């Protein structure tokens, strides 16, 4: 601001007259500049968080991170400062493609509550994805990652309580060995799973005898989505959507080989479990939330 820089050399009245600037406007601008200077620490912290998380965080998650760092700030201010600096979170791209089997299932959807509306003579189905503790409800699915060098398939297990990826397998083909390896890793990590509900869609691998037996031997109860209804497994679908939006869409051509893609997928899952905070988990990461609950003993 030229008037501010010259006021120490010349009378303010003369400078305001020459610049045709009202006194009230000058002091308003001066106050605004002073206010912006006070925001320097916050803005620097916002920039650090934004680039540390590779533009994956929007203003709400950045607000939670700032509060963790001791800043007293609300989401409205963070949104305003981010907008001023031109910092915007990655936005969802085209819907990802999730690999589906083509067999008919017979297992019931245990996450679906049937409510009869007698007054309006209709039946309403309400999905219930709430789990009060870890190892109460797990979900799984398979999703495809396609680049010029080929395809990789990700098969993870998601705990619906703390949204943690319990185990996963990355394979060049969606075969049962992939599913078996995923289960073995989860079962080695968690020993007491009796009564756990394990939900999936109607993919062919979840209808195999070997899959049924593996769950039954652990006392696990199987649940399956209704045919052709992806919303019945939306927590798992949402994870795939977040993952692809934050590390895959727009970056496909940066992966020169399947090995590079697999490393990026593994790094993201590690990041998701241990660094990426979730607003519904009170601003904690999945692992932090588990460690603060009884899940740590399971």
Positions of PLM-derived features:
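Residue-centric detector for conserved, function-critical "anchor" positions
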Residues: 1-9, 14, 36, 298
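K/E-rich alpha-helical interaction surfaces of small helical-bundle regulatory domains
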Residues: 13-33, 52-55, 60, 264-282
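Mobile genetic element proteins and their domesticated derivatives, centered on retroelements
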Residues: 15-19, 26, 46, 62, ...
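Basic, flexible linker segments flanking DNA-binding modules
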Residues: 23-132, 229, 287-294
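RNase H-like two-metal-ion nuclease catalytic core shared by retroviral integrases
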Residues: 98-102, 200-202, 208-211, 224-244, ...
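Active-site beta-loop-alpha junctions of metal-dependent nucleic acid enzymes
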Residues: 146, 150, 169-191
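Short loop/turn microsegments at loop-to-beta-strand junctions
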Residues: 152-155, 166
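C-terminal domain-tail junction helix/linker
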Residues: 216-220, 242-298
């Amino acid at each position: 601001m030229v008037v501010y820089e010259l006021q120490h050399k010349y009378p303010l009245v003369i400078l305001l007259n020459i610049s045709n600037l009202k006194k009230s406007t000058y002091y308003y601008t001066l106050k605004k500049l002073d206010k912006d200077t006070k925001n320097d620490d916050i803005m620097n912290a916002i920039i650090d968080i934004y680039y540390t998380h590779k533009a994956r965080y929007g203003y709400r998650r950045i607000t939670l991170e700032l509060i963790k760092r001791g800043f007293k700030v609300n989401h409205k201010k963070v949104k305003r400062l981010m907008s001023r600096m031109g910092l915007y979170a990655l936005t969802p791209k085209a819907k990802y493609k999730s690999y589906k089997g083509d067999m008919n299932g017979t297992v019931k959807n245990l996450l679906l509550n049937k409510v009869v509306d007698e007054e309006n003579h209709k039946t309403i189905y309400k999905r219930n994805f709430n789990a009060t503790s870890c190892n109460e409800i797990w979900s799984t699915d398979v999703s495809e990652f396609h680049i010029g060098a080929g395809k990789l398939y990700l098969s993870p297990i998601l705990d619906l309580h703390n949204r943690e990826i319990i185990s996963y397998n990355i394979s060049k083909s969606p075969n049962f060995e992939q599913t078996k390896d995923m289960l073995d890793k989860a079962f080695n990590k968690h020993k007491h799973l009796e009564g756990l509900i394990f939900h999936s869609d109607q993919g062919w691998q979840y209808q195999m005898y070997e899959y049924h037996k593996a769950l039954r031997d652990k006392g696990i109860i199987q649940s399956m989505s209704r045919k052709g209804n992806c919303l019945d497994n939306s927590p798992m679908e949402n994870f795939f959507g977040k993952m692809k939006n934050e590390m895959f869409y727009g970056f496909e051509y940066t992966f020169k080989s399947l090995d590079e893609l697999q490393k990026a997928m593994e790094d993201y899952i590690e990041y998701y479990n241990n660094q990426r905070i979730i607003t519904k988990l009170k601003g904690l990461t999945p692992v932090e939330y588990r460690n603060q609950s009884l899940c740590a003993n399971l």
